[in-house]
Amino acid sequence: MAKKIFYFLLVLFAIIQLFQPDRNNSTENLKSELTNLYKLPDSIENLLSTTCYDCHSNNTDYPFVINIQPFGWYMESKVTKGKKHLNFSEFGNYKKEEAIEKLEDIDLAMQNNRMPLQAYRWYNSESNLT
């Protein structure tokens, strides 16, 4: 009986691999991109690209686990949720008050060690803010 359950789970695992999430990959360079709107110091621009842009822009640099389900589904849901809260690729579309509020939220989240997410720091060592 244990073998049957194992084989069933193995087949199920293989089948779910056929259902890959949509990827957040855009090569478009938008005028509304934060770095196109403001001249940022290189250190800040580098910090944003290594710690924030994978979840908060229109272009995610995915690790290999995106191809393994259900990890890929989980990761894509986090990217979608992250872009809903803040999208640097569309930063210029925010109203001035909203943009200021988002920048304040970034500062607070980083000070309280809530961002980047722990799971992201685990596979992206460049994102550790120490």
Regions found by a protein language model. Give the residues of each.
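Post-cleavage N-terminal segment of exported redox proteins
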Residues: 1-38
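Short, compositionally biased low-complexity segments
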Residues: 19-20, 40, 49, 76-80, ...
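Start-of-domain marker
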Residues: 37-45, 61
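The canonical Cys-X-X-Cys-His
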Residues: 48-59
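Acidic helix-start/capping segments at beta-turn-to-alpha-helix junctions
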Residues: 62-76
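Extracytoplasmic electron-transfer domains, predominantly the class I c-type cytochrome c fold
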Residues: 73-122
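Short, exposed beta-strand-loop hairpins at the edges of beta-sheets
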Residues: 126-130
